[in-house]
Amino acid sequence: MADLPHPLAAFIVTEIRRARGASGMTQDAFGRGAGFSASHVSAVESETRALTLDFIKGADRAFKNGGLFERMVGKLGAPSWFLPWLDAERTATQLRCFQPSLVPGLLQTESYGRAVIRCNDTLSDDEVERRLAHRMDRQETLTKATAPHFVAVIAEAVLRRARADFRDIMAGQIKQLTTLAERPNINIHLLPDEVSMHVGLTGPFSLARLPDHKWVAEMENQLGGVVIDRDDDVDTLMSRWEMVRSEALPRQQSLDLMKEVVTSWT
């Protein structure tokens, strides 16, 4: 977390460090209880080593607190399974994202993101705003000094499908996409409507290339999601990425189409 600590991860690290100090545990004693070396604990606490879900679970074991820190991650807007992906996203040198049904979270406007999150009508207003704030914080990934090269493939239908009362939100969202698409580190490609059959129909996925050149992936479903690091599975998703990317429009044609589509919402 040396270059730009993720707000959520940095907060959790601070709370773990504070709890350790309040309990009187040394880093060595805490590490024995958590299953990590004292040097590992020191590196996480000084934010020179990434916070992981395993470390959070280890902290809960060391403090015997019934899973407090893992629950805290969820309460602050990110499910615990998502934390490894947040770290991958933050440290990645390259990001790839395919979305057949929504604008990717890293590209969403606040209004669009709020509307999407509100589709889950079981969430309270406070929970909606917590999740939205977390999503907006993540977008710093694409604008920081060491921003990764980000390539998104979005189905054209995503930009054309909305309720009548969604017009202003959608217009604002597409305008933001056209602005972001002008950034040198961001490529946005539209998968045109006429490509009706493709390998991406089975669902969205993302890929991240880490500083050690290893690729990891993330997939979501109705019950949550999973971060994938098994080489064979990542290779399969990389192959599918290449297939959907090859079906999408080139960068400039995609930008021109976005500018055309936005006029239908204004």
Give short role names for the model-derived ranges:
Residues 45, 89, 220:
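Acidic-residue sensor for enzyme active/binding pockets
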Residues 1, 60, 69, 85-88, ...:
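Bulky hydrophobic/aromatic packing residues
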Residues 94, 100-266:
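Hydrophobic protein-protein interaction segments
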